[in-house]
Amino acid sequence: MRTFHRLPRILAITVPLAAIVATAACGASTTDEATAASTPVATAAAPAPVDGADGLVSQNRLGVGAAQTAAQAALAKCQADGLGFVTVSVVDRNGNVQAMLRGDNAAQHTVEAARQKAYTAAAFGANTSDLSERAKGDGATVADLPGTLFLAGGVSVKSASGSIAGIGVGGAPDGMQDQACAAAGLDAIAGALG
């Protein structure tokens, strides 16, 4: 068997094994009986399907129009409050950015802060101001999770199926000001959430 010295160890094992499995699936013989008996082959049994399940998962998501509306309403609220230096981010349940608006005078750090607050709210299904207590304490806490930010300024967007998105605002001098702007974004799309 040819080995791949420059590949990580898992690839050096996986690539030849994949070739053996693929060839065997086509009905061809890949080795003689002696070699086949001494070659370990990993197998995995698929779990039995659940009655009526077809293997697909449906997820509700905000449409691009609703995401833009929420971002615009949140930024408009901040601007009306004299906070034109914030960034607003709307993300889906998995943290993928659906809409982002950066105020004219927003610093670069506000971009990531808004995205992380939005993701935290979406992932936990709660406003980040309510979650901040969970991030306190000695030792490991939820605050150690990558991509999260447990500061006020993120609101969860929910439908009947649960949390589907998050709206985050970053850059105001106080997190509750960020939170008020994010809440204005949520209010702007509340009627579309059903």
Regions found by a protein language model. Give the residues of each.
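Classic N-terminal secretory signal peptides
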Residues: 16-20
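C-terminal motif of bacterial Sec signal peptides marking the signal peptidase cleavage site
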Residues: 21-25
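Flexible, solvent-exposed loop/hinge segments and secondary-structure transition points
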Residues: 27-194
